[in-house]
Amino acid sequence: GVWRESEDLGTRLIQSPDQAKAGETVRTRAHGESRATLDALRERGAEVVSAVCPHVERIRKLAQEAEREGRRVILIGERHHPEVQGIAGWCSDPLIFENVQEVQKYLQEHPDFAHLPSIMLAQTTCIRARWESCVKFLKKQCTNLKINDTICNATQKRQTEAADLSAKED
């Protein structure tokens, strides 16, 4: 596979920045990394080469731009997924929700949030129905919300095809 070929060329997998060596070239994963991780790699003297997916990079830039505008970032996705963690690592205080129930609970506990400027972004692999239920709820509740559907179309197509295939198999 790809990793075997990379290892044959002298590439090694590291789990944390403290495993990087000065002068070593480190390629980031497609899911992206937090600002803290990239800073730690550079502090160790590693040369960082970004392999982040352009769709993920776009979400990170949207989040940063929104924060500069004074908006709170709302990420819909799997909170422990590397992509979500990487994007969140570029934000000052993002809200991460996995489903509409979590969104509803948060708004019940923080009713003033509905009037604050915010932006809603999705993990690229977020399940469309989950995203849409969160959008529907927040649209009704929030008075200053920007919504950016950042689900990757190619991923969405594969998810739909997989669901169709499994339905046929049942």
Segment roles from a protein language model:
Residues 1-170:
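The feature marks the mature, well-folded catalytic cores of soluble enzymes
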